[in-house]
Regions:
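Rossmann-fold dinucleotide-binding core
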Residues: 308-344
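Feature representing long, continuous alpha-helical segments
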Residues: 247, 258, 318-322, 353, ...
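Short glycine-/small-residue-rich Rossmann-like dinucleotide-binding loops
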Residues: 205, 251, 275-276, 302-303, ...
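PLP-dependent aminotransferase-like
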Residues: 217-252
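A structured beta-alpha segment of the ubiquitous adenosine-cofactor-binding alpha/beta core
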Residues: 245-291
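Acyl-CoA thioester-binding alpha/beta core of soluble enzymes
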Residues: 1-230, 261-266, 288-305, 327-334, ...
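Glycine-rich beta-alpha-beta "Rossmann" dinucleotide-binding loop(s) and their flanking helix/strand
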Residues: 285-291, 303, 313-321
Length: 449
C-alpha cells in the first residue's frame, strides 16, 4: 500500500529511506495494520521530501507498526477522568426486513432526521421495531433524503455493481491539479520544526481531516480550526484538537464569509471535509478560494467520492464500511450473524494521514515550482484500496490492543484534566513530532492568525 500512496503523491525532492519494522496486527479480516503503517509512512516520507528540498539529503523515516495501529484508535489516556461515548444511544446497526442498516445519529440533526422517518422517539427498542419493517435500501434512501446519514449493508460484489461503487473505483487514489502561481514559494522552518511559519486553515470535523491537521501541527504548523457556532463533538475533541487553536465562524453569514476569506488570504494550506458541494453553496468555490489566496495548497476529502450519484451524500467511516462491502466481508468471513466492522475507524485515519501527505507534497511543489495545488480523496476510495488488497479469508492478527501502548510520561494539562499520550508513530530524523499546545475545546480562540 505504501507504493500506491507514494505513486499517488509523486512529489518533488529526494526520496528518503523508509524503515517499516515488523510488529503486531489489529484483529481484522483486512490488512488494517498494513494500512496504518503505510499511510503514516506516506506522511513521514512527504515531510522528508520537503526537508530534502533545502539541499541536504532527505532524512530517514521510521514508522512503528504497533504505534501506528494504536494511533488509529485513540492516542490519549485520560488521567482521572473519562471521555464521553462517541456514539449516540440510537446509533448503530439494525436488522431490516431484508438485511441490515446502520443509522448514524451522533449529530442531533442526523438523529432527528432518522427518527422523523421512522416515526418514533429515541427509544432504541422502538427504533429497532420500526426499522424491522423496512427494506434496507428503501430506509437508507428515506433517511438520506431528509438530511440524515444511513447506509444499508452491501457486499463487495453489490458495491462493485452499484453506480457509486463503479464511480469510486474509476477515481484515482488522489486527484491532483496545479492552480495559480504563488506570490512567494515560502521558506523552510528550522530543522527540528520544518513547518514553523506554515499557516493551515482547518475546516474539518470528527476524524479524517482533524487527524491530518493534528499531524501538521506536530511538525510546527500554525493550525487554526474553524467551526460553526452550533457544532461540537465532545467525544473526539480532546483527541483531535492537539496542537491547534479553535475558533468559531458562521460561513453562512456575509460577515463570516468575509472573515473566512480574510483568513484564507494569509493561509498556506486549506484542509476541508465538507460535502462536495457545500463550500460552493456558501459562495466559496475553488475559483473564489484560489483568487483569495494565489498559490494555496487546497486539500479536501468527502465520504463517497467526487463523481457519481452519491458524490454529495453525507457519510462517515462506519457508513462507508457498510456501503463498500467491508462490514459484509467481516460478517461472512468470521461467520457472524451481523455486520462486522473494522476494529478501528481505519478509513478516517488512513485518509487523514494521506491528506497530511498531500498537504506536505503541495508545499514541496510550491517551493520547487512556485504554484499552488488542489488535492482530493475520499473515504470510499481508501475503502476501495483496502478491499483491493484483499480479505485474509479469516480473522488475522495477534490481538494487538490499540489501547495497549504505554503512554509517555509528560502530562498534557487540559481543561478536562490531565492527559498522557502514547508516543508518536513516526520518526523523521531531526524533526521529532511534538505539539506546543494542549488539546482544547472548540471555539476558545479568536479567528485570527
Amino acid at each position: 500500500m505504501l507504493t500506491q500512496f507514494m505513486n499517488a503523491l509523486a512529489g518533488p525532492g529526494p526520496s528518503p529511506d523508509i524503515l517499516l519494522p515488523a510488529g503486531g496486527s489489529l484483529p481484522s479480516v483486512f490488512a488494517v495494520s498494513d494500512l496504518a503503517q503505510a499511510s503514516v509512512a506516506a506522511a513521514g516520507a512527504a515531510l522528508a521530501r520537503l526537508v530534502g528540498l533545502e539541499g541536504a539529503s532527505a532524512p530517514a523515516v521510521l514508522v512503528d507498526r504497533d504505534l501506528a495501529s494504536a494511533w488509529f484508535g485513540f492516542s490519549l489516556r485520560p488521567q482521572g477522568w473519562t471521555l464521553p461515548s462517541p456514539w449516540d444511544a440510537v446509533a448503530g446497526d439494525y436488522a431490516t426486513a431484508d438485511g441490515w442498516i446502520k443509522l448514524h445519529t451522533n449529530a442531533p440533526h442526523h438523529r432527528d432526521a432518522a427518527l422523523s422517518v421512522l416515526g418514533v422517539d429515541g427509544d432504541r427498542d422502538a427504533v429497532a421495531a420500526a426499522v424491522s419493517g423496512w427494506e434496507a435500501t428503501a430506509l437508507e434512501t428515506a433517511v438520506v433524503t431528509v438530511g440524515g446519514a444511513a447506509a444499508a449493508l452491501r457486499s463487495v460484489g453489490e458495491w462493485d455493481g452499484h453506480p457509486q461503487g463503479r464511480a469510486v473505483a474509476a477515481e484515482p487514489l488522489l486527484q491532483v491539479g496545479s492552480t495559480s502561481t504563488a506570490p512567494s514559494a515560502g521558506t523552510a522552518g528550522p530543522d527540528d520544526r520544518p513547518l514553523a511559519g506554515v499557516r493551515v486553515l482547518d475546516l474539518t470535523r470528527v476524524l479524517a481531516g482533524p487527524v491530518a491537521t493534528r499531524l501538521l501541527a506536530g511538525w510546527g504548523a500554525d493550525v487554526l480550526r474553524i467551526d460553526p457556532p452550533w457544532w461540537d463533538e465532545p467525544a473526539v475533541v480532546p483527541e483531535v484538537t492537539l496542537g491547534k487553536r479553535c475558533a468559531r465562524v458562521d460561513l453562512a453569514t456575509p460577515g463570516g464569509r468575509d472573515r473566512f476569506l480574510d483568513l484564507l488570504g494569509s493561509a498556506d494550506v486549506l484542509v476541508h471535509g465538507y460535502r462536495a458541494d457545500a463550500l460552493e453553496g456558501l459562495g466559496l468555490g475553488p475559483d473564489i478560494r484560489d483568487d483569495a489566496r494565489p498559490g494555496l495548497v487546497d486539500v479536501s476529502l468527502d465520504a463517497y467520492g467526487w463523481t457519481g450519484p452519491w458524490s454529495t451524500r453525507r457519510g462517515f467511516d462506519s457508513l462507508v464500511q457498510m456501503s463498500s462491502g467491508i462490514a459484509h466481508a467481516g460478517m461472512v468471513t468470521t461467520g457472524g450473524d451481523r455486520p462486522v466492522s473494522l476494529p478501528v475507524q481505519a478509513l478516517d485515519h488512513a485518509t487523514g494521514y494521506l491528506l497530511a501527505a498531500a498537504a506536505l507534497t503541495g508545499l514541496a511543489r510550491r517551493r520547487a515550482e512556485g504554484t499552488g495545488s488542489r488535492w482530493r480523496t475520499s473515504l470510499a476510495r481508501i475503502a476501495r484500496l483496502l478491499v483491493d488488497v484483499g480479505s485474509a479469508g479469516g480473522l488475522v492478527g495477534d490481538g494487538i490492543d490499540p489501547e495497549a501502548p504505554r503512554p509517555a510520561d509528560p502530562v498534557e494539562h487540559t481543561v478536562w484534566g490531565g492527559v498522557r499520550r502514547i508516543p508518536p508513530p513516526v520518526t523523521v530524523a531531526g524533526a521529532p513530532l511534538h505539539w506546543s499546545l494542549p488539546a482544547g475545546p472548540l471555539g476558545t480562540s479568536v479567528a485570527a492568525w
